[in-house]
UniProtKB/Swiss-Prot annotation:
It holds the Pfam family Fungal_trans_2. Iso-A82775C is a precursor for the biosynthesis of the anticancer natural products chloropestolides A to E via a Diesls-Alder reaction with maldoxin. In the absence of the prenyltransferase iacE, siccayne accumulates instead of iso-A82775C and can also be condensed with maldoxin to produce chloropestolides H to K, which show also antibacterial and anticancer properties. This is Transcription factor iacI. One of its GO terms (cellular component) is nucleus. Transcription factor; part of the gene cluster that mediates the biosynthesis of iso-A82775C, a enylepoxycyclohexane and biosynthetic precursor of the chloropestolide anticancer natural products. Disulfide bonds: none annotated. The keyword Lipid biosynthesis does not apply. One of its GO terms (molecular function) is transcription cis-regulatory region binding. InterPro entries: Fun_TF. Signal peptide: none annotated. GO terms for biological process: positive regulation of transcription by RNA polymerase II. Keywords: Nucleus, Transcription, Transcription regulation.
Amino acid sequence: MSLLDLPTLWNASGVEALDSDLFEYFCCVASGSLPTFGHDATALRNILVRTALEGETASAAAVLQALLAFSSLHRYGLQPQALELKITALGSLAKGSFTPGLGTKETIEHIAAGMLLSSFEVHQSSCTSGHWTGYLGGVKTITDMSSVKTLLQFSSDVAVLLDWVHYHNVLARFSLLYWNGEETSEFPSTPTNLLSSQDSSLPPPIYSMMDLLSQICDLSNSAIPTGTSDEVDNYKGFLKVLDWRIRSLPIKGDNDGEMLLMKLYQLALLLFLNRSFEGLIDQPIRMQQQIGQAFAILPRLSSCRQQFPIYVIGCEARTDEQRAAVLDLITKTEKMSTSRSFNHCRTLLQAVWTQDDLAEWDDISYRAKLTLVISRCAVAPIFV
Protein backbone atom coordinates (compact mmCIF):
# COMPACT_ATOMS: atom_id res chain seq x y z
CA MET A 1 0.00 0.00 0.00
CA SER A 2 1.23 3.52 -0.78
CA LEU A 3 0.06 6.84 0.59
CA LEU A 4 -2.02 7.17 -2.56
CA ASP A 5 -4.19 4.34 -1.26
CA LEU A 6 -5.27 6.38 1.77
CA PRO A 7 -8.60 8.23 1.60
CA THR A 8 -8.19 11.58 -0.15
CA LEU A 9 -9.55 13.56 2.80
CA TRP A 10 -6.29 12.82 4.61
CA ASN A 11 -3.75 15.51 3.88
CA ALA A 12 -0.23 14.30 4.64
CA SER A 13 1.30 17.76 4.15
CA GLY A 14 1.76 17.97 7.92
CA VAL A 15 4.30 15.16 7.71
CA GLU A 16 7.83 16.47 7.27
CA ALA A 17 9.72 15.11 4.29
CA LEU A 18 12.19 13.30 6.55
CA ASP A 19 9.29 11.61 8.37
CA SER A 20 7.24 10.61 5.32
CA ASP A 21 9.10 7.30 5.16
CA LEU A 22 8.17 6.53 8.76
CA PHE A 23 4.58 7.57 8.12
CA GLU A 24 4.23 5.23 5.16
CA TYR A 25 5.99 2.47 7.09
CA PHE A 26 3.43 2.84 9.88
CA CYS A 27 0.56 2.62 7.39
CA CYS A 28 1.98 -0.40 5.59
CA VAL A 29 3.76 -2.39 8.31
CA ALA A 30 4.05 -1.08 11.86
CA SER A 31 0.34 -0.50 12.44
CA GLY A 32 -0.23 -4.23 12.01
CA SER A 33 1.84 -4.92 15.14
CA LEU A 34 -0.27 -2.79 17.49
CA PRO A 35 -1.48 -5.22 20.19
CA THR A 36 -5.10 -6.16 19.46
CA PHE A 37 -7.54 -9.05 19.74
CA GLY A 38 -10.48 -9.29 17.38
CA HIS A 39 -10.01 -5.76 16.09
CA ASP A 40 -10.00 -4.79 12.44
CA ALA A 41 -6.34 -3.78 12.05
CA THR A 42 -7.12 -1.63 9.01
CA ALA A 43 -9.91 0.22 10.82
CA LEU A 44 -7.64 0.90 13.80
CA ARG A 45 -4.88 2.17 11.53
CA ASN A 46 -7.36 4.38 9.69
CA ILE A 47 -8.70 6.16 12.76
CA LEU A 48 -5.18 6.71 14.14
CA VAL A 49 -3.91 8.14 10.85
CA ARG A 50 -6.98 10.30 10.33
CA THR A 51 -6.79 11.64 13.88
CA ALA A 52 -3.13 12.47 13.35
CA LEU A 53 -3.64 14.32 10.06
CA GLU A 54 -7.02 16.02 10.36
CA GLY A 55 -6.42 18.01 13.53
CA GLU A 56 -4.55 21.28 13.93
CA THR A 57 -4.27 21.13 17.73
CA ALA A 58 -1.29 20.28 19.92
CA SER A 59 -2.94 16.97 20.83
CA ALA A 60 -3.34 16.08 17.12
CA ALA A 61 0.36 16.81 16.66
CA ALA A 62 1.02 14.47 19.59
CA VAL A 63 -0.85 11.68 17.77
CA LEU A 64 1.29 12.14 14.66
CA GLN A 65 4.53 12.30 16.65
CA ALA A 66 3.61 9.23 18.73
CA LEU A 67 2.66 7.39 15.53
CA LEU A 68 6.04 8.22 13.99
CA ALA A 69 7.84 7.25 17.21
CA PHE A 70 6.18 3.82 17.19
CA SER A 71 7.02 3.42 13.50
CA SER A 72 10.68 4.30 14.13
CA LEU A 73 10.86 1.89 17.07
CA HIS A 74 9.31 -0.92 15.02
CA ARG A 75 11.61 -0.34 12.05
CA TYR A 76 14.95 0.46 13.70
CA GLY A 77 14.61 -0.59 17.34
CA LEU A 78 15.20 1.67 20.32
CA GLN A 79 17.45 4.49 19.08
CA PRO A 80 17.67 8.32 19.33
CA GLN A 81 15.13 9.07 16.57
CA ALA A 82 12.39 7.00 18.23
CA LEU A 83 13.12 8.51 21.64
CA GLU A 84 13.18 12.07 20.30
CA LEU A 85 9.83 11.59 18.57
CA LYS A 86 8.35 10.13 21.75
CA ILE A 87 9.61 13.05 23.85
CA THR A 88 8.22 15.51 21.29
CA ALA A 89 4.86 13.73 21.42
CA LEU A 90 4.83 14.00 25.21
CA GLY A 91 5.54 17.72 24.96
CA SER A 92 2.71 18.25 22.49
CA LEU A 93 0.35 16.18 24.63
CA ALA A 94 1.23 18.20 27.72
CA LYS A 95 0.63 21.43 25.78
CA GLY A 96 -2.74 20.13 24.58
CA SER A 97 -3.71 19.22 28.14
CA PHE A 98 -3.72 22.89 29.12
CA THR A 99 -6.62 23.53 26.73
CA PRO A 100 -9.62 24.40 28.95
CA GLY A 101 -12.56 22.02 28.55
CA LEU A 102 -11.42 19.40 26.06
CA GLY A 103 -13.89 19.03 23.20
CA THR A 104 -14.86 15.72 21.67
CA LYS A 105 -12.23 15.90 18.94
CA GLU A 106 -9.46 16.80 21.39
CA THR A 107 -10.56 13.98 23.70
CA ILE A 108 -10.23 11.47 20.87
CA GLU A 109 -6.80 12.91 20.03
CA HIS A 110 -5.65 12.49 23.64
CA ILE A 111 -6.90 8.90 23.70
CA ALA A 112 -5.14 8.03 20.42
CA ALA A 113 -1.85 9.65 21.48
CA GLY A 114 -1.90 7.97 24.89
CA MET A 115 -2.56 4.55 23.38
CA LEU A 116 0.26 4.95 20.85
CA LEU A 117 2.66 5.99 23.62
CA SER A 118 1.60 2.99 25.70
CA SER A 119 2.11 0.72 22.67
CA PHE A 120 5.58 2.24 22.20
CA GLU A 121 6.50 1.24 25.76
CA VAL A 122 5.29 -2.36 25.59
CA HIS A 123 6.50 -3.16 22.06
CA GLN A 124 9.96 -4.38 23.08
CA SER A 125 9.20 -5.45 26.68
CA SER A 126 12.48 -3.94 27.85
CA CYS A 127 13.54 -3.02 31.38
CA THR A 128 12.83 0.65 30.54
CA SER A 129 9.28 0.07 29.33
CA GLY A 130 7.46 0.61 32.60
CA HIS A 131 5.74 3.87 31.68
CA TRP A 132 2.90 2.10 29.88
CA THR A 133 0.84 2.07 33.08
CA GLY A 134 1.01 5.86 33.31
CA TYR A 135 -0.01 6.41 29.68
CA LEU A 136 -2.80 3.84 29.83
CA GLY A 137 -3.96 5.19 33.18
CA GLY A 138 -4.14 8.68 31.67
CA VAL A 139 -6.23 7.38 28.78
CA LYS A 140 -8.53 5.60 31.21
CA THR A 141 -8.99 8.78 33.26
CA ILE A 142 -9.95 10.72 30.12
CA THR A 143 -12.42 8.08 28.95
CA ASP A 144 -13.98 7.85 32.42
CA MET A 145 -14.59 11.61 32.33
CA SER A 146 -16.05 11.56 28.82
CA SER A 147 -19.48 10.80 27.42
CA VAL A 148 -19.05 7.64 25.37
CA LYS A 149 -22.29 8.41 23.54
CA THR A 150 -20.89 11.79 22.44
CA LEU A 151 -17.60 10.21 21.33
CA LEU A 152 -19.44 7.61 19.24
CA GLN A 153 -21.59 10.29 17.61
CA PHE A 154 -18.46 12.13 16.50
CA SER A 155 -17.35 9.30 14.21
CA SER A 156 -18.57 5.78 13.56
CA ASP A 157 -15.10 4.24 13.91
CA VAL A 158 -14.43 5.68 17.38
CA ALA A 159 -15.78 2.35 18.67
CA VAL A 160 -12.64 0.69 17.26
CA LEU A 161 -10.46 3.03 19.32
CA LEU A 162 -12.49 2.54 22.51
CA ASP A 163 -12.49 -1.24 22.12
CA TRP A 164 -8.71 -1.07 21.82
CA VAL A 165 -8.55 0.93 25.06
CA HIS A 166 -10.81 -1.54 26.85
CA TYR A 167 -8.73 -4.54 25.71
CA HIS A 168 -5.59 -2.98 27.20
CA ASN A 169 -7.42 -1.95 30.38
CA VAL A 170 -8.60 -5.50 31.06
CA LEU A 171 -5.20 -7.09 30.42
CA ALA A 172 -3.52 -4.41 32.53
CA ARG A 173 -5.78 -5.29 35.44
CA PHE A 174 -4.80 -8.95 35.02
CA SER A 175 -1.08 -8.06 35.25
CA LEU A 176 -1.48 -5.65 38.15
CA LEU A 177 -3.33 -8.26 40.22
CA TYR A 178 0.07 -9.89 40.66
CA TRP A 179 2.39 -6.89 40.55
CA ASN A 180 3.71 -5.27 43.72
CA GLY A 181 5.60 -2.40 42.10
CA GLU A 182 4.97 1.33 42.26
CA GLU A 183 3.28 1.47 38.86
CA THR A 184 0.00 0.19 40.31
CA SER A 185 -0.67 3.61 41.83
CA GLU A 186 -0.64 5.16 38.35
CA PHE A 187 -3.45 2.97 37.09
CA PRO A 188 -7.08 3.50 38.19
CA SER A 189 -8.39 0.27 39.70
CA THR A 190 -12.06 0.73 38.86
CA PRO A 191 -13.21 -1.51 35.99
CA THR A 192 -14.74 0.23 33.00
CA ASN A 193 -16.62 -1.45 30.19
CA LEU A 194 -16.59 1.44 27.74
CA LEU A 195 -19.03 0.07 25.18
CA SER A 196 -22.13 -2.06 25.21
CA SER A 197 -22.10 -5.16 23.02
CA GLN A 198 -24.34 -3.28 20.55
CA ASP A 199 -21.86 -0.40 20.17
CA SER A 200 -18.67 -2.46 20.20
CA SER A 201 -16.86 -3.21 16.96
CA LEU A 202 -15.62 -6.55 18.32
CA PRO A 203 -17.10 -9.90 17.29
CA PRO A 204 -19.60 -10.92 20.03
CA PRO A 205 -17.56 -13.90 21.36
CA ILE A 206 -14.44 -11.75 21.80
CA TYR A 207 -16.44 -8.95 23.42
CA SER A 208 -17.82 -11.56 25.85
CA MET A 209 -14.33 -12.94 26.54
CA MET A 210 -13.08 -9.50 27.57
CA ASP A 211 -16.15 -8.97 29.73
CA LEU A 212 -15.69 -12.34 31.44
CA LEU A 213 -11.96 -11.79 32.00
CA SER A 214 -12.79 -8.41 33.55
CA GLN A 215 -15.28 -10.07 35.90
CA ILE A 216 -12.75 -12.71 36.96
CA CYS A 217 -10.24 -9.94 37.72
CA ASP A 218 -12.91 -8.15 39.78
CA LEU A 219 -13.53 -11.28 41.84
CA SER A 220 -9.82 -12.00 42.22
CA ASN A 221 -9.31 -8.49 43.59
CA SER A 222 -12.08 -8.82 46.18
CA ALA A 223 -12.33 -10.80 49.40
CA ILE A 224 -13.84 -14.28 49.25
CA PRO A 225 -16.87 -14.48 51.57
CA THR A 226 -16.15 -16.19 54.87
CA GLY A 227 -19.52 -15.56 56.50
CA THR A 228 -22.60 -17.74 56.46
CA SER A 229 -22.84 -20.91 54.42
CA ASP A 230 -25.47 -19.19 52.25
CA GLU A 231 -23.01 -16.43 51.31
CA VAL A 232 -20.34 -18.96 50.42
CA ASP A 233 -22.82 -21.06 48.44
CA ASN A 234 -23.98 -17.97 46.51
CA TYR A 235 -20.36 -17.11 45.72
CA LYS A 236 -19.68 -20.65 44.50
CA GLY A 237 -22.85 -20.47 42.44
CA PHE A 238 -21.66 -17.28 40.74
CA LEU A 239 -18.30 -18.89 39.94
CA LYS A 240 -20.11 -21.85 38.37
CA VAL A 241 -22.18 -19.44 36.28
CA LEU A 242 -18.99 -17.74 35.04
CA ASP A 243 -17.51 -21.14 34.21
CA TRP A 244 -20.67 -22.09 32.30
CA ARG A 245 -20.73 -18.76 30.43
CA ILE A 246 -17.14 -19.24 29.28
CA ARG A 247 -17.79 -22.84 28.19
CA SER A 248 -20.93 -21.73 26.34
CA LEU A 249 -19.20 -19.09 24.20
CA PRO A 250 -19.89 -19.65 20.49
CA ILE A 251 -16.48 -20.18 18.91
CA LYS A 252 -16.58 -19.02 15.30
CA GLY A 253 -14.03 -17.73 12.83
CA ASP A 254 -13.41 -17.03 9.17
CA ASN A 255 -10.81 -19.80 9.05
CA ASP A 256 -9.39 -22.64 11.13
CA GLY A 257 -6.60 -20.45 12.53
CA GLU A 258 -9.05 -17.90 13.93
CA MET A 259 -11.24 -20.61 15.45
CA LEU A 260 -8.26 -22.31 17.08
CA LEU A 261 -7.05 -19.01 18.52
CA MET A 262 -10.47 -18.22 19.98
CA LYS A 263 -10.71 -21.75 21.41
CA LEU A 264 -7.27 -21.28 22.99
CA TYR A 265 -8.37 -18.00 24.57
CA GLN A 266 -11.54 -19.67 25.86
CA LEU A 267 -9.51 -22.48 27.45
CA ALA A 268 -7.13 -19.94 29.01
CA LEU A 269 -10.09 -18.14 30.60
CA LEU A 270 -11.41 -21.42 32.01
CA LEU A 271 -8.02 -22.36 33.43
CA PHE A 272 -7.50 -18.90 34.91
CA LEU A 273 -10.92 -19.01 36.58
CA ASN A 274 -10.45 -22.53 37.95
CA ARG A 275 -6.91 -21.94 39.20
CA SER A 276 -7.84 -18.59 40.78
CA PHE A 277 -10.62 -20.18 42.81
CA GLU A 278 -9.26 -23.65 43.55
CA GLY A 279 -11.25 -25.17 46.37
CA LEU A 280 -14.37 -23.27 45.36
CA ILE A 281 -14.58 -24.73 41.85
CA ASP A 282 -13.83 -28.41 42.25
CA GLN A 283 -13.70 -30.08 38.83
CA PRO A 284 -10.20 -31.60 38.47
CA ILE A 285 -11.13 -34.04 35.70
CA ARG A 286 -12.67 -31.34 33.50
CA MET A 287 -9.70 -29.04 34.12
CA GLN A 288 -7.21 -31.72 33.08
CA GLN A 289 -9.23 -32.26 29.92
CA GLN A 290 -9.08 -28.52 29.20
CA ILE A 291 -5.32 -28.48 29.74
CA GLY A 292 -4.98 -31.37 27.29
CA GLN A 293 -7.13 -29.58 24.72
CA ALA A 294 -5.03 -26.42 25.04
CA PHE A 295 -1.73 -28.21 24.47
CA ALA A 296 -3.22 -30.06 21.51
CA ILE A 297 -4.04 -26.70 19.90
CA LEU A 298 -0.59 -25.08 20.33
CA PRO A 299 1.28 -26.99 17.56
CA ARG A 300 -1.63 -26.42 15.16
CA LEU A 301 -1.26 -22.63 15.36
CA SER A 302 1.09 -20.80 13.00
CA SER A 303 1.27 -17.90 15.48
CA CYS A 304 -0.43 -16.36 18.51
CA ARG A 305 0.17 -12.63 18.99
CA GLN A 306 -2.01 -12.52 22.12
CA GLN A 307 0.18 -13.22 25.13
CA PHE A 308 -2.49 -13.86 27.80
CA PRO A 309 -3.43 -17.37 26.62
CA ILE A 310 0.20 -18.34 26.05
CA TYR A 311 1.12 -17.27 29.58
CA VAL A 312 -1.85 -18.84 31.37
CA ILE A 313 -1.60 -22.11 29.44
CA GLY A 314 2.19 -22.06 29.63
CA CYS A 315 1.96 -22.01 33.42
CA GLU A 316 0.30 -25.43 33.15
CA ALA A 317 3.22 -26.98 31.21
CA ARG A 318 4.76 -29.80 33.25
CA THR A 319 6.57 -31.89 30.65
CA ASP A 320 9.44 -31.00 28.32
CA GLU A 321 7.15 -31.68 25.37
CA GLN A 322 4.52 -29.22 26.61
CA ARG A 323 7.11 -26.54 27.33
CA ALA A 324 8.70 -27.03 23.92
CA ALA A 325 5.27 -26.54 22.30
CA VAL A 326 4.83 -23.23 24.13
CA LEU A 327 8.32 -21.96 23.25
CA ASP A 328 7.96 -23.10 19.64
CA LEU A 329 4.75 -21.08 19.25
CA ILE A 330 6.42 -18.03 20.79
CA THR A 331 9.36 -18.38 18.37
CA LYS A 332 7.06 -18.72 15.34
CA THR A 333 5.08 -15.66 16.45
CA GLU A 334 8.15 -13.48 17.04
CA LYS A 335 9.33 -14.14 13.47
CA MET A 336 6.28 -12.28 12.16
CA SER A 337 6.61 -8.57 11.35
CA THR A 338 3.37 -7.98 13.24
CA SER A 339 4.63 -9.47 16.52
CA ARG A 340 5.94 -7.60 19.52
CA SER A 341 8.56 -8.95 21.90
CA PHE A 342 7.69 -11.92 24.13
CA ASN A 343 10.65 -11.20 26.46
CA HIS A 344 8.57 -10.82 29.61
CA CYS A 345 6.23 -13.69 28.80
CA ARG A 346 9.06 -16.12 28.01
CA THR A 347 11.14 -15.13 31.06
CA LEU A 348 8.17 -15.40 33.41
CA LEU A 349 7.21 -18.83 32.08
CA GLN A 350 10.76 -20.11 32.48
CA ALA A 351 10.75 -18.85 36.08
CA VAL A 352 7.49 -20.71 36.76
CA TRP A 353 8.85 -23.91 35.21
CA THR A 354 12.07 -23.72 37.22
CA GLN A 355 10.15 -23.42 40.46
CA ASP A 356 7.77 -26.19 39.39
CA ASP A 357 10.74 -28.50 38.82
CA LEU A 358 12.11 -27.64 42.26
CA ALA A 359 8.69 -28.44 43.75
CA GLU A 360 8.68 -25.08 45.52
CA TRP A 361 4.98 -24.47 44.89
CA ASP A 362 3.69 -27.02 47.41
CA ASP A 363 0.97 -25.53 49.59
CA ILE A 364 1.07 -22.18 47.78
CA SER A 365 -1.96 -20.60 46.13
CA TYR A 366 -2.18 -19.84 42.42
CA ARG A 367 -2.32 -16.11 43.18
CA ALA A 368 0.75 -16.28 45.42
CA LYS A 369 2.58 -18.25 42.73
CA LEU A 370 1.89 -15.69 40.00
CA THR A 371 2.63 -12.81 42.37
CA LEU A 372 6.02 -14.22 43.34
CA VAL A 373 7.01 -14.59 39.68
CA ILE A 374 5.49 -11.46 38.11
CA SER A 375 6.70 -9.17 40.90
CA ARG A 376 10.28 -10.17 40.08
CA CYS A 377 10.04 -8.17 36.84
CA ALA A 378 11.77 -4.80 36.93
CA VAL A 379 8.65 -3.29 35.33
CA ALA A 380 5.06 -4.49 35.16
CA PRO A 381 4.47 -6.79 32.17
CA ILE A 382 1.30 -6.64 30.10
CA PHE A 383 -0.02 -9.70 28.28
CA VAL A 384 -1.78 -8.05 25.31
